[in-house]
């Protein structure tokens, strides 16, 4: 059975460190996991999509996702690890957890964005929600 990890990527410095941690972890354990780089774009509310055609919305979400994934893809190509990148649309936390489960990932790796637990709860932190929703281990990288 091949080990696979989902790495949540939003283009931030903490998510870049999550990618670096996955590379380091694979090298130190002498693993060749399949890495799923996943960026989740928010779905636009219906009152916005009434005025913008679906193709424009799709293009915007794809371009934004590609920008967020670019650096992570470069790092993984240089590492020689097997990976695939995915841009999904929806609420970030449940979308990440669902993707990880559907693809039999052994863990989710994501950056911790440095909010305190109380602030994170009030802000609806994606990290807090993923930890709460996921039946899989979640590795948070500072």
Give the positions of each predicted feature.
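A short acidic, glycine-rich active-site loop
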Residues: 54-67
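Small/aliphatic-rich secondary-structure junction motif
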Residues: 1-51
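Short beta->alpha linker loops
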Residues: 52, 87-91, 113
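Phosphate- and divalent-cation-binding pockets in alpha/beta enzyme and binding domains
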Residues: 17, 95, 117
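Small-residue (primarily alanine) positions within well-ordered alpha-helices
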Residues: 15-18, 22, 72, 100, ...
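Structural beta-alpha unit
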Residues: 74-108
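General small-molecule cofactor/ligand-binding pocket signal
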Residues: 36-38, 84-88, 139
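Gly/Ser-rich helix-loop-strand patches that form or flank binding pockets
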Residues: 98-142
